[in-house]
Structures are given as structure tokens and as C-alpha cells.
Amino acid sequence: MPGRFTVALVIALGGTCGVADALPLGQTDDPMIVAHRAGTRDFPENTVLAITNAVAAGVDGMWLTVQVSSDGVPVLYRPSDLATLTDGAGPVNSKTVQQLQQLNAGWNFTTPGVEGHPYRQRATPIPTLEQAIGATPPDMTLFLDLKQTPPQPLVSAVAQVLTRTGAAGRSIVYSTNADITAAASRQEGLQVAESRDVTRQRLFNMALNHHCDPQPDPGKWAGFELHRDVTVTEEFTLGSGISAVNAELWDEASVDCFRSQSGMKVMGFAVKTVDDYRLAHKIGLDAVLVDSPLAAQQWRH
């Protein structure tokens, strides 16, 4: 019995690729190209420099990572420690916005194939969320990935900026943290993407037992990696068995599950190649999240 279970499980996950390759195009429109952290491969991520270059490369949407300063101002920054990307150190919420904007967000940025750190002599400040919004076209969709706990100070500050700038209607709030997603969902005036936990559960239910459950949430965005390394664990009386799988959980059936009777929009994360983009188009994804807008601008041709 354990042997049959393991084989069936691998087929259910691994077989997705072969099925998807044979599918007809799922939609006539190209998927939106969304710049991940404003184009983290091309320029220092989450900076106005990256935003303006991603816009020039023709992206359709902007994915920005947001935390809040000690004085309550939302800024763009992803890691938990400023030392990861900048010439500073410590958490974002340990410094005022004025202190944060004196740091160089490109301090540790490197370009593949180029020696050194090209932005150490060219300061690229950490922008506020308001500055970032001002650098995008007024009709561009923004995806705001909230990366800081406790959630409420960040959620409230983001809501205030979106209201003040008039950008709430074109902004989707997202987080991998369930508490942040819940807090954002309670905040008046915010459009919030589906919880990653719910998205992941529905995708695995579709892959493993072909059930579209939990029920899709009408009108929301949902996202997950186009390819995802996962570990499947099976428990036995005398221990456990583990299988490592590179899963393609998005396929035509899962996309249809999310959209069926709900109008959900779906995004594939970590789309890195033209073949990934073609697969996303084939199965009908609404958008793809890319690290290099400069590379992605060629995929549509």
C-alpha cells in the first residue's frame, strides 16, 4: 500500500508538465508582466531607479515590498535587516524615514558578469511608498507585498498613503504572512489578495484529488510559483517516507478552478524564461511575476 501511494502521488504532481505542454492556448491576451520588486535582477530592488526602468521596459504592473519606519512612514524594503542590501544595519522599524533615506539601497547590488558593486558610488535611496507611487503611471496596477510584523502599524500606514494618493483602486495588498493578510482584510478601503495558505491548499487539492476546494473567493487575486520545489512526507508505523518534487501546480484545470464562478485573477510567480512565459500563456494565467523586465520585454515578440 505505501508503495502504490507514493507512485500515485509523484504521477499526480509530475504529470502536470506533460499535460500542460499539449494544451491549446488558454487565452488570446498575453499575461500581464509584473516587475518583481520593481525588477530585482536589473537594478537595485524596490528603488525609484528600478521602477522607472521597469516602466520604460513596458511592464504592466509593479510588485513592491513594503515595511514601515519607526515614525510610521511606509517605505520600500524587503529583508528583515538593513545590512542585507544597504550600508546600514538593523530592522527598518528601528529607524526614522529620514535615517532610512540616507542609506544606499544599492550598496550590495551586483550585476551578473560584472565585478564589484556598481551602485556604491551612485546612491540609490530607499524610497517611501508615496514616492514609489508617484514614479508609476497613474493607471498601472500595483501589488504591495507587506513584509513586517506586527501587522497593524504597517497596514494602517499603507492604507493612509493609498487613500491620500488616490492609488487604493489600483493597488492589491499581498502577504505571505496570514496575520498580515487578515489585518489588511479588516482594513477599510484595501483590496487584498487571497491568503497564500488558502491558495496553496486549493492548488494541492486540485493536484492530488482534483477537488476545487476551498471555494474560490470572488474577485480576488491569487498567486503561486509556476514551478515550486516541495517535499511530500508520508507517515508509516515505523517512520516516514519523503519525496522531493519540482511541482507545476498551475495548469489549465487549476486556473479554471480559481476562475470558475468567482472571477478570480491568477498570477504565476518566479517566471524566469520565455518558455515559462509561453506556459503561462498556454494555461491562461492573468499575470506573471518577473525579476528581469529587460529580459521579459522580449518574450511577447
UniProtKB/Swiss-Prot annotation:
<dbReference type="GO" id="GO:0006629">
    <property type="term" value="P:lipid metabolic process"/>
</dbReference>
<feature type="domain" description="GP-PDE">
    <location>
        <begin position="31"/>
        <end position="300"/>
    </location>
</feature>
<feature type="signal peptide">
    <location>
        <begin position="1"/>
        <end position="22"/>
    </location>
</feature>
<dbReference type="Pfam" id="PF03009">
    <property type="entry name" value="GDPD"/>
</dbReference>
<keyword id="KW-0732">Signal</keyword>
<dbReference type="InterPro" id="IPR030395">
    <property type="entry name" value="GP_PDE_dom"/>
</dbReference>
<protein>
    <recommendedName>
        <fullName>Uncharacterized protein Rv2277c</fullName>
    </recommendedName>
</protein>
<dbReference type="InterPro" id="IPR017946">
    <property type="entry name" value="PLC-like_Pdiesterase_TIM-brl"/>
</dbReference>
<dbReference type="GO" id="GO:0008081">
    <property type="term" value="F:phosphoric diester hydrolase activity"/>
</dbReference>
